[in-house]
């Protein structure tokens, strides 16, 4: 997801709250 800590392979934030 877009909200959370760390970047995923797409360059967006991962780990939705």
UniProtKB/Swiss-Prot annotation:
Its main location: secreted. GO terms for cellular component: extracellular region. Keywords: Isopeptide bond, Secreted. It comes from the Bacteria. Disulfide bonds: none annotated. It is found in: Secreted. There is a cross-link at residues 1-8 (Isoaspartyl glycine isopeptide (Gly-Asn)). Competitive antagonist of atrial natriuretic peptide NPR-A receptors. It binds competitively to atrial natriuretic peptide (ANP) receptors from bovine adrenal cortex and inhibits the ANP-induced intracellular cGMP accumulation in bovine aorta smooth muscle cells. Can also reduce the increase in cGMP produced by ANP or BNP (brain natriuretic peptide) in pregnant guinea pig myometrium, but has no effect on relaxation induced by either peptide. Blocks the ANP-induced human sperm acrosome reaction without affecting the acrosomal exocytosis or sperm motility. Anantin has been tested for antimicrobial activity against a broad variety of bacteria and fungi, but no antibiotic activity has been found. Inhibits the binding of ANP by 50% (IC(50)) at 1.0 uM. This is Anantin.
């Amino acid at each position: 997801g877009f909200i959370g800590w760390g970047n995923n392979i797409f360059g967006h934030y991962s780990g939705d709250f």
